[in-house]
């Protein structure tokens, strides 16, 4: 948020304004009214303070950075570890108690569905680079198979 509600840097008539010059005061007011504030929970300290963070007026979403959180917990990428699951539950509980949204990234459709079932209300699907890699791999495999079939059928 822009002051007096936050400490966001100011830049106007650029990409987030579609490069359209506008009245700065109305732009600030509109951004403050409609902007979404997402805070990342990526450490045990963030988990321990999730309730206090969620209680901050103006915070809309607590987003779990699952790789960073598991890494800082000393259990990298062990997303089924009981300590990791307890940390996630703690953040979900904080969001429920304070009426905030919990969010996280899911890398597969199945992961996204599980996150939604657990109570996450904001779920991002896949990393852009990973989705791009999967698409390229699939396409190249089809091309190679097609080429191999043609070579053997001549």
Name each model-derived stretch.
Residues 2-12, 72-86, 126-128:
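Glycine-rich tight-turn/loop motif centered on a GG-T
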Residues 1-2, 55-61, 117-123:
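Glycine-enriched alpha-helix->loop->beta-strand junction motifs that scaffold or abut catalytic
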Residues 53, 65, 115:
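Conserved, mostly hydrophobic/aromatic
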Residues 1-4, 129-153:
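C-terminal helical cap(s) of enzyme catalytic domains, especially alpha/beta-barrels
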Residues 37-42, 62-64, 102-105, 122-125:
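Hydrophobic faces of well-ordered beta-strands that scaffold small-molecule active sites
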Residues 62-71, 120-139:
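Glycine-rich phosphate-binding active-site loops on the catalytic face of alpha/beta enzymes
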Residues 1-57, 68-71, 152-153:
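Conserved anion-binding
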